[in-house]
Structure formats: C-alpha cells, structure tokens
Amino acid sequence: MIETPSAAIISDLLAKEVDFFSIGTNDLTGYTMAVDRGNAAVSKLYDPIQPAVLRLIETTIKNAKKAGIPVGMCGEAAADTRLIPLLCKWGLDEFSVTPSSILHTRKSICECE
C-alpha cells in the first residue's frame, strides 16, 4: 500500500519486493499536504490535484510499470473525474471506488480510451 510520500518516493525500490501496488490516495494526499481532511480549519487545502500529490502518484505508477507489476488506486481520488484522464494516461490498472461512484468513474475511463 502506497500511502505515504516516503513510500511513493522509493516506489522503484519497493516494486522489486512486491507483487502489486495499491495507492491509498486519502492518506497520501493528507500526509503530502500536511492536512487533516476532517479538520474544517484546514480541509480546504486537502486536494489530490495538488502538484506534489500528482507527482507522487505519477512516480508510483511509472515505477510499477517499469517493474512489470499492476497498480491500483483506492480513495476519493480514484473517482475524481478531474484526475481520471491523467491516471489513464499514466497507465493505472485498477480503480477502486465506492458503489455510488462506479457509473461516473466508468464513464470517465471510457472517455479516455
């Protein structure tokens, strides 16, 4: 599970030791941006579209691809239609989303193809 910035940064090394990656975007975003999404005073800063978060996600996906292992994503970002085109472009293999997000996520993925 890639949930911390440090794990994403060394994902090239971790990829040699595991069979797959799952990127946990809720924690990855929170730890990267140093915000608690449940804290109203700072929750507006919680956004997986921030460049630092995007770079960590892209790095992790690219390192998984180089190592020949599948990579999936869970958390709110997996269903974020602003992010799905990038995830498709980078080669994300699996999107794990809530049941209420399946249809719009599937539609967004189909629009990428």
Show the residue positions of the predicted features:
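Conserved alpha/beta-domain cores
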Residues: M1-E113
